[in-house]
Each structure stands twice: as C-alpha cells, then as structure tokens.
C-alpha cells in the first residue's frame, strides 16, 4: 500500500506525532507502514537477525541505534532476510550500508546516513521496549507510516482506505 504522510497529517493532525526530519530513504519502496516492533542496539546488529526471521507481514522494525553513524546496523544480508519474511519496512536511528543493494529490494528503509563500516554481531540489545528519538516516543504496537516526505506515528492504525 502507498502512503502519503502529508495527506495523513492533514486528515489526522490531532492523532499523529511527526518524527523530526532526520531520515532519508534507502530502500526500494518509497512508502511503507505498519505496526512497529522496537529494538535498541548500539553498533551491534546481532539481535536483528532473529527478529527478521519472524513473519513481518504488516510490521515495521524500528531500530534505536543511538544515532550512531560510525557503524551500519542494516546491510544487504539483513535487508534481504527482512524482505524474504515480508517485513514492510525498517527505520534506523543510525546508519546503513550497501545502499545500491538496499535500493533494489522491495522493502522500505529509512535511516540517518550510509557508511561502509559494518556493525558488531554480539547480539547486544533489547527489543519491545520504549525508545525515544526524533522528538517522538515509540512503543512496540504503535503504527508508523513513512514516505520520502517524512515519518509519522499513531497509537492506533489510521483508516487509510
């Protein structure tokens, strides 16, 4: 489904939170949305492999990487795994790498920056916890909508159709 965050803000301005404009699109989908699962991990993406093994239909993985752009949390291998398991999208408060490969995949990916250095894979981090960045607090189960204009968040799903 295609989302227009500008239109959604016009319709639901009282019901949505708008994330500060820190992110760029790196995925093959220009818009995406779904119920979020939150993860907090700093320069380590080991936990993400297990999460992307889950069925991602209707889901978006929201990663709080502490805003670090020193190491990429998402690479082509992880994004392919997410695509295979039907994840709608990924939002990274941090960096990605292998951006040409990411752009070829049918998944939405928003991140702060790209860098060629990969993350560690110790599995250090937490999932399904409250995270805060971009002026918004995110909880697993909230609904996120993203396009090239921005990212918005709603406690409940928005009536799009």
Curated annotation (Swiss-Prot):
It is found in: Cytoplasm. Pfam families: RraA-like. Its main location: cytoplasm. One of its GO terms (molecular function) is enzyme binding. SUPFAM superfamilies: RraA-like. One of its GO terms (biological process) is negative regulation of RNA catabolic process. Belongs to the RraA family. Homotrimer. Binds to both RNA-binding sites in the C-terminal region of Rne and to RhlB. HAMAP family: RraA. Globally modulates RNA abundance by binding to RNase E (Rne) and regulating its endonucleolytic activity. Can modulate Rne action in a substrate-dependent manner by altering the composition of the degradosome. Modulates RNA-binding and helicase activities of the degradosome. This is Regulator of ribonuclease activity A. It comes from Pectobacterium atrosepticum (strain SCRI 1043 / ATCC BAA-672). The gene is rraA.
């Amino acid at each position: 489904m295609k989302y227009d965050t500008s239109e959604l803000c016009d319709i639901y301005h009282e019901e949505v939170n708008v994330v500060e404009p820190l992110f760029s699109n790196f995925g093959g989908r220009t818009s995406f949305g779904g119920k979020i699962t939150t993860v907090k991990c700093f320069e380590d993406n080991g936990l993400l492999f297990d999460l992307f093994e889950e069925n991602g239909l209707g889901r978006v993985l929201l990663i709080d990487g502490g805003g670090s752009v020193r190491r990429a949390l998402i690479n082509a291998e992880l994004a392919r795994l997410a695509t295979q398991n039907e994840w709608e999208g990924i939002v990274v408060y941090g960096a990605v790498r292998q951006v040409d490969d990411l752009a070829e995949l049918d998944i939405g990916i928003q991140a702060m920056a790209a860098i060629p250095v990969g993350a560690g894979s110790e599995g250090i981090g937490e999932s399904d916890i409250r995270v805060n960045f971009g002026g918004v607090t995110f909880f697993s189960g909230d609904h996120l909508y993203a396009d090239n204009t921005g990212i918005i968040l709603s406690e409940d799903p928005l009536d799009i159709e």
